[in-house]
C-alpha cells in the first residue's frame, strides 16, 4: 500500500522542504515549477477535498488558502508532525491511498502530489476503484506526480541521473513504482473516469480525472 517507503520519508521529513525548493541538486528537475504544480492541483479541485500524502503540508496550505475544506491523509508520523506545526487545527489522519479512516464529510475532490507512485500498478487500480466510490457525482481526482510516456523514457531518465552522478535519484526511479501514462489512463477509464494529462516538467504530469456516471 506504499507503506514500504515510510522509513525513507521519516528520514527525509526534516529536509523535504529544502528538496522542493531546489536546494537538493539531485531533485531540482523533479521539483521544477513546484509552485505551479501545486497551483494547478488547487485550481482544478473543488470545495471538499481529500488529500493523500500530505507530507509537510505544502499543497494543504494552498488548498486552505483557496477556501477549500481539507481532510488530509499521511502515513508518515514525522511528516504529519511537521504539517500540523505549519497548519494548526487541520485534520491530518494516519492512513494511505487504500486504507484510511471513515470520512466525516462528502468528498468532491481527491488530490495528491508526489505520492501516487508509491503504489504498484495493481494497488493504483484498487485505489482508483475506491476513488470512484468515495467521490460525489462529477467529482475530480487531481494528482501531480512523476510518470513517463514510455518505458524507454523512464530508462532514459535513470541513465541520465547515473551519468550526472545522481545516485540517489537513479535508485529512487528504479525502486519506486513510477508508472507509464497509458497504464494510469487505462485504470481510470476502467472505473468510469474521463482523464487527461498535462506535463509540468521532465518528470511530473498533472492527472485530471472526472468521475462520470
From Swiss-Prot:
CDD domains associated with the record: AdoMet_MTases
One of the GO biological process terms: methylation
Binding locations of S-adenosyl-L-methionine: 53, 74, 96
Pfam families registered for this protein in UniProt: Methyltransf_25 (PF13649)
Keywords (A to Z) from UniProt: Methyltransferase, S-adenosyl-L-methionine, Transferase
GO molecular function: S-adenosylmethionine-dependent methyltransferase activity
Gene3D superfamilies given in the database record: Vaccinia Virus protein VP39
InterPro entries: Methyltransf_25, SAM-dependent_MTases_sf, Uncharacterised_MeTfrase_YrrT
Listed PANTHER family: TRANS-ACONITATE 2-METHYLTRANSFERASE-RELATED
Function: Could be a S-adenosyl-L-methionine-dependent methyltransferase.
Homology family: Belongs to the methyltransferase superfamily. YrrT family.
Name of the protein this chain belongs to: Uncharacterized methyltransferase OB1106
Organism (species): Oceanobacillus iheyensis (strain DSM 14371 / CIP 107618 / JCM 11309 / KCTC 3954 / HTE831)
